């Protein structure tokens, strides 16, 4: 790459002079998109995003070790309690609700995938602002989340041409979440186009987030920032200009290569939703890189009737990304913290082989002491493929039985992998039921079913507060 060409899109070329400001285009899209024109497939996927995000938020209230600390902080801050703290049976100011719910939604690393973690940056914001404003219909909430996710997906670097790539020192979820969150909040708060431009500008001034996993705070920070930007813009506070395209805009400050793909960024807004092309859900509550090894071991278990006690050893080979989930090996085989367990190939595929699934309870304190799992994890070995390519993210899993038989599998598209192997509606609902069972505020089975039904018919809901009262 010619470093001299970096940021050349900021120069005042002919196209630059005639191209409309991208932030204004997004603001207009968010402010004026008609909810009754949302394509059915997008509406269906957005409902799944909302259900899935609420579920992971509920589960974190008791399963995430750090959740009580965040909850205590929010309670201690006080303020006007008008927005639901999901899973607690309490309320807090809108900004604090967006923060805590955002953190919890992302804290278990069980939230959806695709163009970054888009739902945790948008759904908690939408619910908090809708409750704050009141009178927000389900169809409006649905449209707001769909618009925000689409903006986030369009801006997500890896879904554009290969020459446009975000500097990996920054979190895509958090950095882009300020913009998508502000678009969602502004839409729900009914801001006109000009004020939404200001909200995006105020959001940009807060953009941050090192690419280091930290207790779900990527989603909490951008959610809180998006609400703050929207509330200030609503009151008439101006935001900075040229926030995406300008010399000091996001593309120049946070991107490192050549011209952004403007056709992808703004083409066919409201008609083509990239969410449909770049979105998936996690079938298992583990690090995303564990999904392929899990799928492979489950496939071998089912096809050959394998049982843990019959296995002599399991070998997993892949690129450097796979090796990171196995070092140091002794600690990964016997994790002492849920995050360590989720990011462990030996422990996680041992769970999958022993039980034929991987569930939330497998990462609890009791689950990490499961002797059957630990004994098998001691027989799991992970190897570096000396010639790794991106395709080899599909790790090769080989099982050797005690009678000398060898079986292997290399699943490329695990369950939940966007369009290629999507989770069914029933699978997503069952995941929600499992998550909801861990809520700090107990939710009766009948209420869990009511939540599923309300979200499934969200476009018919007169006021979103009918949903939030159940959370």
State each model region's role.
Residues 119-128, 177-182, 223-228, 290-292, ...:
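Well-ordered alpha-helical segments within folded domains of soluble proteins
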Residues 1-115, 217-224, 231-471:
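Terminal-appendage/accessory-domain detector
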Residues 24, 28, 52, 124, ...:
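Generic structural signal for well-ordered, non-membrane alpha-helices
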Residues 91, 96-155:
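Function-dense linear segments that define catalytic or interfacial modules
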Residues 131-228, 242-247:
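Glycine-rich, mobile lid/loop segments that gate access to catalytic sites or pores
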Residues 43, 47, 51, 122, ...:
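Hydrophobic face of alpha-helices
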């Amino acid at each position: 790459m010619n470093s001299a060409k970096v940021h050349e899109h900021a120069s005042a070329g002919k196209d630059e002079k005639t191209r409309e400001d991208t932030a204004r285009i997004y603001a207009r899209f968010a402010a004026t998109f008609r909810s009754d024109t949302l394509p059915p497939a997008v509406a269906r996927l957005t409902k799944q995003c909302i259900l899935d995000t609420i579920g992971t938020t509920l589960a974190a209230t008791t399963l995430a070790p750090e959740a009580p600390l965040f909850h205590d902080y929010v309670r201690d801050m006080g303020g006007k309690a008008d927005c639901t703290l999901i899973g607690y049976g309490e309320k807090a100011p809108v900004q604090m609700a967006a923060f805590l719910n955002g953190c919890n939604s992302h804290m278990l690393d069980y939230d959806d995938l695709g163009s970054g973690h888009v739902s945790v940056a948008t759904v908690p914001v939408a619910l908090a602002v809708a409750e704050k404003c009141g009178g927000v219909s389900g169809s409006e909430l649905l449209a707001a989340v769909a618009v925000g996710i689409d903006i986030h997906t369009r801006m997500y670097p890896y879904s554009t041409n290969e020459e446009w790539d975000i500097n990996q020192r920054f979190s895509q979820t958090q950095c882009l979440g300020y913009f998508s969150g502000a678009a969602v909040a502004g839409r729900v708060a009914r801001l006109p186009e000009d004020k939404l431009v200001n909200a995006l500008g105020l959001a940009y001034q807060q953009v941050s987030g090192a690419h280091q996993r930290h207790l779900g705070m990527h989603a909490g920070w951008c959610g809180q920032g998006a609400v703050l930007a929207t509330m200030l813009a609503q009151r008439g506070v101006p935001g900075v200009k040229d926030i995406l395209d300008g010399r000091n805009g996001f593309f120049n400050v946070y991107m490192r290569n050549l011209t952004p793909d403007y056709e992808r960024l703004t083409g066919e807004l409201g008609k083509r939703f990239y969410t449909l092309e770049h979105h998936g859900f996690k079938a298992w509550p583990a690090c995303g890189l564990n999904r392929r090894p899990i799928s492979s071991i489950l496939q071998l278990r089912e096809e050959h009737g394998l049982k843990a006690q019959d296995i002599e050893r399991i070998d997993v080979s892949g690129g450097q990304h796979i090796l990171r989930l196995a070092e140091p090996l002794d600690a990964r085989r016997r994790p002492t913290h849920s995050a360590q367990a989720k990011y462990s190939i030996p422990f996680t595929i041992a769970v999958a082989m022993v039980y034929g699934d991987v569930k939330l309870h497998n990462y609890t304190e009791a689950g990490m002491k499961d002797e059957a799992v630990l004994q098998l994890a001691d027989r799991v070995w992970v190897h570096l493929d000396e010639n790794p390519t991106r395709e080899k993210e599909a790790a090769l899993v080989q099982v050797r039985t005690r009678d000398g038989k060898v079986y292997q599998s290399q699943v490329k598209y695990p369950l939940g992998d966007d369009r290629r192997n999507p989770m069914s509606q029933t699978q997503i609902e069952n995941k929600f039921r499992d998550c909801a069972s861990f809520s700090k505020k107990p939710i009766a089975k009948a209420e869990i079913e009511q939540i599923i039904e309300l979200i499934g018919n969200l476009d018919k809901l007169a006021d979103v507060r009918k949903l939030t009262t159940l959370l």
